[in-house]
Amino acid sequence: MAEQAPEFMGPSDHPLDPPSREEIAAAGSLLKKRLGDEVIFASLALIEPPKRQVIEFESNAQKTPNQLGRMVCVQGYDTVKKQSFVATVDVTANVVTEIRYISEGQAPLNFPDVVRVITICKTDEGWQNAMRARGVEDVTDVQIDPWPTGGYIHPNVPEGHRAMRAISFVREDKFDNGYARPVQGLIAHVDLTDEKIVFLEDHGVVDLPPEHGRYQPEHQPSLREAPRPISITQPEGTSFKVDGHAIK
């Protein structure tokens, strides 16, 4: 017998349950009304109620539904003001209670940032010329990996701007393993606030590795024998119980 969490979990039954799909959607909708549809969300987490209230709820043997208000903390990037923010949303009352803009540091980087870096690089003339110098004319399938700047932010990036670094890998098509052909000595320093490459670090042309790194069976000289079947079962049923988000 398999124990599986339900595909969809509705409103919270316990005050410490993680935010449900409904609560996440509500928080996103409320913030988009305040900040616009182009706002970028980086993270969302439950703001736990006071411990005293949780103990009181549990000491009541959970005989009554969760009556405690549900609050979430959302970090993101306001594309209009071009600033990171931290917001508090009451998803029980359906209201944004606070939006605080970050003066030092940034909200966590996220997938929309990655997409923006790739677009900025591939449309930059300087980056395109650097790829041509390495024999790459068509950059459609070039793989670009954006990385956080860490403690090393290029001086051309203004203070307070959102930034990443990008390195490139050459692929023959979208199914190729780009990591077999790194473009060595070329790093793009990207200012995400102004959406441009502020410095292209180019240490000179290094020949691309000639061999591919594909994993598909048709590209291998031979294949190993497939492993024999393995089964892990509890024929008499599970020895644990799933109760909401608790495993007992």
Write out the residue ranges for each language-model feature.
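Basic/polar N-terminal segments that are highly enriched at the extreme N-terminus
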Residues: 1-13, 29, 33, 62, ...
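Intrinsically disordered, low-structural-confidence terminal and linker regions
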Residues: 1-23, 45, 209
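Extended, regular secondary-structure scaffolds
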Residues: 2, 102-248
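Acidic/histidine-rich, surface-exposed loop or edge segments in extracytoplasmic proteins
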Residues: 5-15, 94-105
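Interaction-mediating elements
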Residues: 22, 26, 30, 68, ...
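Short amphipathic alpha-helical segments that mediate assembly, nucleic-acid/protein binding
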Residues: 23-24, 39, 114
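Short N-terminal secondary-structure initiator segments
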Residues: 31-51, 209-218
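Exposed beta-strand-loop-beta-strand "reactive/processing" segments of non-cytosolic proteins
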Residues: 37-91, 138-191
